[in-house]
Amino acid sequence: MASVISRAVRFHDDLEKEKLQEGEESHMEMRAYEMSSEYKHGKDAINKPSSNGRGLSRVFSEDYDAGEILVFDPRGPRINLWNKIFLAACLISLFVDPLFFYLPVAKKEKCIDMSIGLEVSLTIIRTFVDAFYIIHIYIRFQTAYIAPSSRVSGRGELIIDSSKIASNYMKKELWSDLVAALPLPQVLIWAVIPNIKGSEMIASRHVVRLVSIFQYLLRLYLIYPLSSKITKASGVMMEKAWAGAAYYLTLYMLASHVLGSTWYLLSIERQDECWKKACTLQYPHCQYHYLDCQSLSDPNRNAWLKSSNLSGLCDQNSHFFQFGIFDDAVTLEITSSNFLTKYYYCLWWGLRNLSSSGENLLTSTHVAEINFAVIVAILGLVLFALLIGNMQTYLQSTTIRLEEWRIRRTDTERWMHHRQLPHYLKENVRRHDQFRWVATRGVDEEAILRDLPVDLRRDIKRHLCLNLVRQVPLFDQMDDRMLDAICERLKPTLCTPGTCIVREGDPVDEMLFIVRGRLDSCTTNGGRTGFFNTCRIGSGDFCGEELLPWALDPRPTAVLPSSTRTVRAITEVEAFALIAEDLKFVAAQFRRLHSKQLRQTFRFYSHQWRTWAACFIQAAWFRYKRMKETNEVKEKENLMMMSNVKYYGNDDSQYFSAPLQVPKGSSYSMYSGKLVGSLRRGRSMRYGSELDMLGTLRKPIEPDFNDDGD
């Protein structure tokens, strides 16, 4: 907005400024400052009125703070939460309104009365539910709407001007919401009906029924746009599969509840028609207002009731009147039962006939009764199909991956049978598929991460892999940017027990960072006889470090390095793999990896360097032992020669004059010579072969650190 306002500000040149007076100049500068500061930020433009008295009327949803203004974003979380709350209130209202049909009660005195206790309870509940409709109207006056002209580009601009919001709402949806919020049943049963007497009492019941049905249909209609708003905001009506199935089952039960209450009201009407027909035969002794319980104190009514045969004429066994599908209400005296009894029976009647599409309904020739049976049959077909279809959709969403895994496993079994794989290979394949399903439940993590934005994908990878990568001492010394680059390129890997990760001598194409499980790493130094080195690696360890010198080489080659060890899984293993090309990319992009500070860390934690260091120390120790034992043999030889001189000498002068001379050909001289030779040959044979074997062990290739900038 600042750029738009800047076009309206006139910039004067130096000549014009000289002509201006000092007061006018300062006034213009202050004016320009006020205009630029007014539209400096979107939030300021909303909170502060403009200089010409007009406020900002439209804005994008991300350009204002919803906590500082009293206009709600229709796509925001608050409106979405309120829509869900209001939807629950609407469902409660749809459940409460049919209960007004249970107000008429057939008394034993052959009259129809209203249940006062039920009237009070329903009035309280209905008034509480109506309050949500009033609150909804108020919220709609405070909710912005999207400008129709801006929908062609992106999400559109929000109209936040209160007058425009009110005008738009009053033109479209206010009147339907207002009629739906009116407490019409309460007004009728408490203010209108008690003031009606005589023959108009019977007609008033029809008015209550028609008004209730009209408002009920209107509230039922308002649920569909409300559900569509929730679906647009969150993508689905219910996030959980069981919640979606329960939602449609609730709607089906609600339809059964409505049909049952309607059937009860029509049963009351049919029974009243039977009484009217009998009353017509006894005219003028019988009047229609006698059928209302307000006339119980009338002595003429009591005299007529004693003389009439009303009970026999309106009995279910009489052929005077056909009750048709309402025969159960008369036979079981449902119309004169208490509320819980008649409610549950009517609910069962509605559910039974809705599920069977009205197959068991035996109607009479009454037109209204036949129409009601037709409506029951049609609603039963439609609603039952919708219930089964939606519940199947929601329930299948929980097992669809399991079915996909079963189909894939069946295809695998057919392929293995077609290729005639041996039994042990089949078992390995089955074990791998089972372990993969248990570990992932058929979810492709890589596909999920690929669909996410780059920053969110980086954060998730960092959360999953950073602690694991930091457990590797070689990578713990790297900076955060390098660790993020490594984490982004790690891919999950699963291994079953007995899986050979890499064999000695095979090209190494990836590094593995172990998350869970144990592996066995061994080497024979290229298959040399008598050489074997083994170790165990587990959680937090890594293997495939032969790739590091290859990745750090400033003159890379296309030939991958050969593995110096055989790595095999002992238990079920979960790991992250870093392939050779990704490691090469990280090494090329981040020069920190070439730091000389990593040299000792790399040597200490590398199994290849550890093996070479152990062999180097053993070779040095063997050389030291051979030199030490050679010196000991020489000392023993000198002592033996000294003892020979002492043995053959006769006097002291001879003993000291030739201390190292031994008569040749003597038996002791020959024995001592053989003994010394055998000792030398034994020591040489013992350490010679080991030194030869260890001496031929090649030193691992060391990373090139010549290009670092330290």
UniProtKB/Swiss-Prot annotation:
Spans traversing the lipid bilayer: 85-105, 115-135, 174-194, 207-226, 248-268, 368-388
GO BP, sorted A to Z: arbuscular mycorrhizal association; nodulation
First and last residue of the signal peptide: none
Tissue: Expressed in roots, stems, leaves, flowers and pods.
UniProt keywords, alphabetically: Ion channel, Ion transport, Ligand-gated ion channel, Membrane, Nucleus, Transmembrane, Transmembrane helix, Transport
Principal subcellular localisation of the protein: nucleus
Subunit note: Interacts (via N-terminus) with DMI1 (via c-terminus). The Nod factor has no effect on this interaction, implying that the complex is maintained after activation.
Protein's recorded name: Protein CNGC15a
Organism the protein comes from: Medicago truncatula
